[in-house]
């Protein structure tokens, strides 16, 4: 096209081309015609070749189309299967969701019905309780009106009897052994056993009357072991002595006191309890009327009659020999030692009582031996000026056990010597009917054994 344009320009133009340009243009035209001829020839050859190969190409094309159609059909069938499976899964899922929805609605309906039924029952119970309360109030008001009418008419008033079912329930329960022995139970009103509160007793109990800083701080030992450094056992015992000389004359002013004990237990239900036993119940009742509600050391005293009359069962025997395995958790009485061992015979139930006969005075020698043992044991305690406590026993238990074992060996050796002396001189004893020098010592080893190893007592709560 450019050549034609150039030729047209050349012929149309007013000026002629130079020979050189003219020859170049002609050469270009010849090359163009030659290329066109070659292209026409090539196209003719291709057409002829295609005509020769046309049956094979058609068959190949048809085969390819057939394979493509089969592949398309196979893919379509697979898609249909997948679609059908997906539809089935969808329908199953919808069915499960519908069933779950129905179950949820049914459950909600049941819960709502149960809640409404429960609310209805609660309303009925509340209404019944209110009705019963109104009936009781009406009965009480009727009883009060009747009592007022009787009082106005000159009648007498008395409290009504308790229900019979409560009495039957109390009879079926077993007695609490610790309340019967010590007058206190660590469970208190929650105890499953029966506490027989006496209406009259020769023993008066004042709970928590004796309090010191050391006894109050014992509750902090579990999480503050250094609290024991702020007080000493000597100070606690000195405070007990001051308390003893302060309160005992007041108790003696009411009647004859035959036992006075102050508990040094660390358990809350026994800590600082004061036990005062009078010779008669009348004196104890008089003391109750005098001291109950009275104030001492900034606290109001609450007195009660105590069932304890046998101190041998109440006092922990192992504590006296510094071998109590329960320590501060013992539920038997750990008591302070009274000055001059006062009322020491009452610790073993040896105080004289009205039912004693003249035959009981034949045991004077036994009591003298026991008293001498108490003097020997408590004399060492007075020199130490220390009140018995679990911590003190824990530090000095080993040395005291060694000394007590040596003491028992010495006593047994003396007993053997006296026995040999007794066997060597039978004629002299027959001649002289008075007891020989060995006879008081004959009872000494059993007394020593009974003092060093007291009667077995349960040391834990049932």
Swiss-Prot record:
Residue ranges, compositional bias (Low complexity): 1-13
Domain RRM: 202-308
Keyword Ubl conjugation: yes
Coiled-coil positions: none
Bias type Basic residues, positions: 404-417
GO CC terms in record: nucleolus; U12-type spliceosomal complex; U2AF complex
Region described as Disordered: 1-22, 44-66, 115-138, 354-462
Molecular-function GO terms, alphabetical: pre-mRNA 3'-splice site binding; zinc ion binding
PTM remark: Phosphorylated in the RS domain by SRPK1.
Cross-link named Glycyl lysine isopeptide (Lys-Gly) (interchain with G-Cter in SUMO2), sites: 49
Zinc finger (C3H1-type) boundaries: 170-198, 310-337
Subcellular localization, as worded in the UniProt entry: Nucleus
Modified residues (Phosphoserine): 353, 389
Keywords assigned: Isopeptide bond, Metal-binding, mRNA processing, mRNA splicing, Nucleus, Phosphoprotein, Repeat, Ribonucleoprotein, RNA-binding, Spliceosome, Ubl conjugation, Zinc, Zinc-finger
Record-level GO BP terms: mRNA splicing, via spliceosome; spliceosomal complex assembly
SUPFAM superfamilies reported for this sequence: RNA-binding domain, RBD
Record's compositionally biased regions (Basic and acidic residues): 57-66, 364-379, 392-403
Oligomeric and partner information: Component of the U11/U12 snRNPs that are part of the U12-type spliceosome. Interacts (via RS domain) with SRSF1 and SRSF2. Interacts with U2AF2/U2AF65.
Role, per record: Pre-mRNA-binding protein required for splicing of both U2- and U12-type introns. Selectively interacts with the 3'-splice site of U2- and U12-type pre-mRNAs and promotes different steps in U2 and U12 intron splicing. Recruited to U12 pre-mRNAs in an ATP-dependent manner and is required for assembly of the prespliceosome, a precursor to other spliceosomal complexes. For U2-type introns, it is selectively and specifically required for the second step of splicing.
Name under which the protein is recorded: U2 small nuclear ribonucleoprotein auxiliary factor 35 kDa subunit-related protein 2
Gene source species: Mus musculus
């Amino acid at each position: 096209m450019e050549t034609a344009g150039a030729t047209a320009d050349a012929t149309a133009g007013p000026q002629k081309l130079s020979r050189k340009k003219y020859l170049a243009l002609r050469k270009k035209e010849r090359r163009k015609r030659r290329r066109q001829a070659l292209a026409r020839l090539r196209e003719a050859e291709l057409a002829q070749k295609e005509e020769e190969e046309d049956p094979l190409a058609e068959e190949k094309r048809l085969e390819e189309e057939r394979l493509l159609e089969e592949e398309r059909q196979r893919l379509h069938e697979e898609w249909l299967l997948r679609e059908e499976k997906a539809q089935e899964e969808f329908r199953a899922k919808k069915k499960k969701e519908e069933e779950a929805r129905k179950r949820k609605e049914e459950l909600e309906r049941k819960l709502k019905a149960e809640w409404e039924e429960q609310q209805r029952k609660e309303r009925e119970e509340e209404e019944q309780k209110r009705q019963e309360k109104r009936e009781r109030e009406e009965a009480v008001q009727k009883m009060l009106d009747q009592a007022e009418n009787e009082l106005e008419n000159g009648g007498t008033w008395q409290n009504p009897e308790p229900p019979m079912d409560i009495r039957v329930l109390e009879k079926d329960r077993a007695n609490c052994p610790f309340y019967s022995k010590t007058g206190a139970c660590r469970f208190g009103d929650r105890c499953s056993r029966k506490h027989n509160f006496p209406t009259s007793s020769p023993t008066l109990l004042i709970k928590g009357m004796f309090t010191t800083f050391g006894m109050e701080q014992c509750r902090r030992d579990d999480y503050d072991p250094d609290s024991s450094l702020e007080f000493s056992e000597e100070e606690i015992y000195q405070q007990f002595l001051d308390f003893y000389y302060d309160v005992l004359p007041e108790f003696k002013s009411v009647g004859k006191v035959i036992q006075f004990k102050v508990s040094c237990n660390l358990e809350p239900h026994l800590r600082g309890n004061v036990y005062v036993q009078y010779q008669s119940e009348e004196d104890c009742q008089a003391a109750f009327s005098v001291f109950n509600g009275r104030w001492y050391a900034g606290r109001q005293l609450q007195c009660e009659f105590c069932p304890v009359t046998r101190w041998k069962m109440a006092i922990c025997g192992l504590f006296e020999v510094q071998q109590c395995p329960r320590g501060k958790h013992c539920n038997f009485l750990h008591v302070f030692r009274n000055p001059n061992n006062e009322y020491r015979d009452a610790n073993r139930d040896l105080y004289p009582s009205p039912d004693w006969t003249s035959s009981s005075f034949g045991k004077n020698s036994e009591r003298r031996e026991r008293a001498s043992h108490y003097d020997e044991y408590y004399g060492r305690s007075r020199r130490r000026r220390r009140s018995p406590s679990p911590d003190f026993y824990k530090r000095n238990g080993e040395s005291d056990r060694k000394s007590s074992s040596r003491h028992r060996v010495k006593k047994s050796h003396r007993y053997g010597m006296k026995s040999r002396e007794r066997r060597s001189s039978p004629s002299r004893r027959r001649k002289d009917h008075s007891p020989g020098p060995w006879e008081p010592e004959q009872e000494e080893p059993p007394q020593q054994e009974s003092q060093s190893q007291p009667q077995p007592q349960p040391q834990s709560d049932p």
